[in-house]
């Protein structure tokens, strides 16, 4: 019965393609794959003709001081990300609470603050903070810029999650005599965070990648270190642009994958805890 229902719902959404349509779709798929493969082959040949895949370009990574610079850049990236993640989540929670406040001045201020920094280009914000206040401390210009921008985004995520909780739950809590602070902290916010956790972690992944903007203000994070290594010629082999990309790029990918895996683990653990509480109450 469920299979029939799925087929019926699918037929409502779109017409089932016939034999000619399926053949046409397969042809489009094959042509797309061939086109992408041809483009990749063209790029590979162009880079290979310029010597970007010469073995000599990898010699830079044999030196201990180069390896240490990459490690230091990675640690600087993680330091900036850790501070920005902590501060942006805290700021986002405060701004979300302010936007949901019953006091109009607080609600208006928090809403204006959130909308302003959401609309502000992050690079302009970081560069402005650097030249205005943190010319000698580029890390704090990067951290504060990431905090203001991502805090505003996190505030909207949390606010949307709270508003998505069924209204009846809050009304029932008020009916039991609970104050608004108790309703928010005990009922609405936990459910909002649980439902919006994937989106919040997704924004933290964006925060992690945005730490690479620190190279613009000479903060020695991972991208800045990679750019410095790539700008040094390796004897007669040339500049190691491709080797640097192949080393630095996967580091960012692994960090983002680990953060995503952490989010899935936290989400699964929260579901198991909720199921246990439901079973115990039953």
Regions found by a protein language model. Give the residues of each.
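Transmembrane alpha-helices and adjacent helix-loop boundaries
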Residues: 2-282
């Amino acid at each position: 019965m469920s299979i029939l229902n799925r087929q019926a719902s699918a037929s409502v959404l779109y017409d089932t393609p016939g034999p000619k349509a399926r053949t046409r779709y397969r042809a489009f798929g094959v042509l797309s794959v061939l086109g992408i493969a041809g483009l990749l082959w063209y790029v590979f040949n162009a880079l290979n003709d310029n010597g970007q895949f010469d073995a000599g370009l990898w010699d830079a990574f044999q030196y201990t001081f180069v390896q240490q610079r990459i490690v230091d850049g990675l640690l600087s990236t993680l330091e900036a990300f850790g501070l920005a993640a902590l501060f942006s989540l805290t700021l986002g929670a405060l701004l979300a609470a302010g936007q949901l406040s019953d006091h109009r001045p607080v609600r208006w201020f928090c809403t204006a603050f959130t909308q302003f920094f959401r609309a502000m280009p992050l690079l302009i914000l970081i560069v402005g903070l650097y030249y205005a206040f943190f010319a000698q401390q580029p890390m704090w210009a990067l951290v504060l810029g990431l905090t203001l921008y991502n805090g505003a985004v996190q505030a909207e995520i949390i606010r949307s999650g709270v508003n998505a909780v069924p209204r009846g739950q809050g009304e029932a809590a008020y009916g039991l005599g609970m104050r608004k602070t108790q309703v928010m902290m005990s009922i609405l916010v936990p459910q909002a965070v649980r439902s919006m956790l994937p989106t919040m972690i997704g924004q933290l992944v964006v925060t992690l990648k945005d730490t690479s903007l620190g190279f613009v203000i000479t903060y020695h994070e991972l991208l800045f270190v990679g750019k410095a290594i790539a700008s040094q010629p390796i004897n007669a082999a040339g500049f190691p642009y491709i080797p640097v990309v192949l080393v630095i790029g996967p580091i960012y990918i692994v960090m983002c994958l680990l953060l995503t895996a952490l989010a899935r683990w936290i989400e699964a653990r929260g579901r198991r805890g909720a199921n246990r509480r439901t079973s115990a109450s039953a």
